[in-house]
Amino acid sequence: MQALLFISYGAILGASLRWAIGLLFNPLFSSFAFGTLIANLFGCLIIGVLLGLFWQFPQISAEWRLFLITGFLGSLTTFSSFSSEVVELFFNDKWLNGFCVLMMHLFGCLAMTVLGIWIYKICLNFYLNPIHFGFAQLNQQIHRYEIRVIAYIAKFFVSF
């Protein structure tokens, strides 16, 4: 029962933030719901940061994981809204818009999750080694990650 409360409290906050993001960003574009994309991208970025944190510190309680990932970010990011918006575009014969929205959500969310993990790792390295951590080292780390991402993307497109 206690786990359900943690999930519920997180879900209230996540759903409220998602609603506010939709109100703010959806009017910007008439062709698709930009707020849903922003909510999903932002949520995936935060999920990446939290994954890095939880991997580094597995002793963080299950309640925090339930509150943050299952509750808050589970209700902030939304697969159902995303899928209904894409299907609506397809049913209205806006195939190109639908496909573009689909790709932006899919690849954007994956990229933001990876970026969140990198942000966490970079911040952790800076926190642990503030004197020895300089811009040259930061650039080297970013370059190593960029090479990995480019390799993964190339493998993905070659697989077709």
Swiss-Prot record:
A single GO molecular function term of this UniProt record: fluoride channel activity
GO terms classed as biological process: cellular detoxification of fluoride; fluoride transmembrane transport
Record flagged with keyword Transport: yes
Regions that span the bilayer: 5-25, 34-54, 67-87, 99-119
Catalytic activity reported: fluoride(in) = fluoride(out)
Source organism, top-level taxon: Bacteria
Keywords assigned: Cell inner membrane, Cell membrane, Ion channel, Ion transport, Membrane, Metal-binding, Sodium, Transmembrane, Transmembrane helix, Transport
InterPro entries xref list: FluC (IPR003691)
Keyword ATP-binding in record: no
This protein's name: Fluoride-specific ion channel FluC
Source organism per UniProt: Haemophilus influenzae (strain ATCC 51907 / DSM 11121 / KW20 / Rd)
